[in-house]
Every structure is written in structure tokens, then in C-alpha cells.
Amino acid sequence: MYYTRITQIERLTDEVATLYFSISLRSYPGQFVMVYVPGCEEIPLSLSSSNSVTVKAVGETTASLINAKEGQYVGVRGAFGSAFTPSKRALIVAGGIGIAPMKYLYEYLMKCGSKVSVVYGERTAKNLFWLDKFDRITVTTEDGSFGLKGTVLDALKLEKLDEYEKIYVCGSEGMLRATYDFLKERDALDKAEFSLERYMRCGIGVCGSCVIENGLRVCADGPVFNASELPW
């Protein structure tokens, strides 16, 4: 485990913040780290760059992180897990805090000269962030307060999916499964990669707490899976 100093905290919404570390990890988009705050449980977090995580306050540890102070030290293990497969023509589909690892992926692909489009969905406009980070982006909100009213599926209906080599998906379990079903109906599932999230204890495939229905471990076999690997 590394003990790293928080060099900067960028508050993005009332519930979301990006924490920048004093170390840069050897990592690829899609991988995650285990983060430890003294007095709290160690948790997995996707990297939003080689030296940052973007966190939504949903529990004790995440609340402690977004309310941390610059200069504070936290423990970090990783990076762990599988990464997204690069492609030249890519569609990124993100729901909610699922946009966090996708920014890392987007920046990586753009440096590789790829053509990248983004679909980003939230419940309401006040939850949106990073809209200025993406050149080609379609935004959806469920209440219609910004962009297209509806979910990411409504935006996907407007996309010519056959133009993309890869479709990368990250979001809530419900969003992932709905997108999986949609892509299956459109015969586009073979080009899709999904980033899953599960409760983890070890992060290295030993404890078995993150096993999915077919026996694969999100921490060691994922968190990025080809659609064909998922039991949906």
C-alpha cells in the first residue's frame, strides 16, 4: 500500500469531488484502486486519471473522502483489474458517477488519435459535471432539465452504432443491464465492453466477495468485461 498525500480536491457537485494524489500510478483506463481512509473501511474506486479518483458520497468512506482536506494522507493499493481495449472509433456511454473512469478513457483515446463520441446520462442537471471535457457529447437528463429528456437509451437510439469499433459502458447495474439488452436488440453487443462495480474486500481475486453469477471475479477478471463474458 502507498500512503499518498491529497494535493487537490475539486468539488464537482454537492455529492461528487475529484481527489488528486501526490503519486501517479502505472495504470490504464478502466482499472481501479483500493483506497483506505484511517478509521473507515477500505473501498474500491475507479481511477479518473493516473493520479486521481472521482468520488460520490454514498457511504462512510466516500463521505470522508469528499470532505477530506488537502494535505491529508490516504492509503492506496493498485492499480488493479482489467482495462478497456483501445479503438479508433469509439462510443462512450456513461450513467451517473460512471462518467468518472470514462474521462480517463476519453483522454487516453484522444491522445491515440481516436474519434470518440460520448453519451452521458443523469437524473437532473444539478448532478452533471465535466461537460466541457468532451468534444462530441450528448447529454440526457431524466427530468429534461438539461439536454435530451430521457435516459442514455434514448440517446443511443439516435446513434449509428455500426460506425463504432467499440462501445464502452459504465454506470449503475440497472443502466448496464438495460444498455446490454438494447445493444443485443441492435446486434451491437459484440463490440461492447462493460465496467462493473461490486463490493470488494481484497481487490486481488482472493476473498470472493465480488463474484458475479457465472463465477467471474470483478476485481481480478474485470472490472471491464466483454459483453460475451456477462451472464445477462
Swiss-Prot record:
Molecular function via GO: 2 iron, 2 sulfur cluster binding; electron transfer activity; flavin adenine dinucleotide binding; metal ion binding; oxidoreductase activity
Protein keywords: 2Fe-2S, Electron transport, FAD, Flavoprotein, Iron, Iron-sulfur, Metal-binding, Pyrimidine biosynthesis, Transport
Gene3D superfamilies the UniProt entry points to: Dihydroorotate dehydrogenase, electron transfer subunit, Nucleotide-binding domain of ferredoxin-NADP reductase (FNR) module, Translation factors
GO biological process: 'de novo' UMP biosynthetic process
Names of the cofactor(s): [2Fe-2S] cluster; FAD
Domain of life: Archaea
Record: residues binding [2Fe-2S] cluster: C202, C207, C210, C219
Keyword Iron-sulfur: yes
Occurrences of domain FAD-binding FR-type (ranges): 1-86
This protein's pathway: Pyrimidine metabolism; UMP biosynthesis via de novo pathway; orotate from (S)-dihydroorotate (NAD(+) route): step 1/1
UniProt key word Disulfide bond: no
Cofactor binding, per record: Binds 1 [2Fe-2S] cluster per subunit.
Pfam families: DHODB_Fe-S_bind, NAD_binding_1
NCBIfam families the UniProt entry points to: PRK00054.1-1
Family to which this protein belongs: Belongs to the PyrK family.
Family matches, as HAMAP family: DHODB_Fe_S_bind
Role, per record: Responsible for channeling the electrons from the oxidation of dihydroorotate from the FMN redox center in the PyrD type B subunit to the ultimate electron acceptor NAD(+).
Subunit and partners: Heterotetramer of 2 PyrK and 2 PyrD type B subunits.
PANTHER family: DIHYDROOROTATE DEHYDROGENASE B (NAD(+)), ELECTRON TRANSFER SUBUNIT, DIHYDROOROTATE DEHYDROGENASE B (NAD(+)), ELECTRON TRANSFER SUBUNIT-RELATED
Protein name: Probable dihydroorotate dehydrogenase B (NAD(+)), electron transfer subunit
Organism: Archaeoglobus fulgidus (strain ATCC 49558 / DSM 4304 / JCM 9628 / NBRC 100126 / VC-16)
Gene for this chain: pyrK
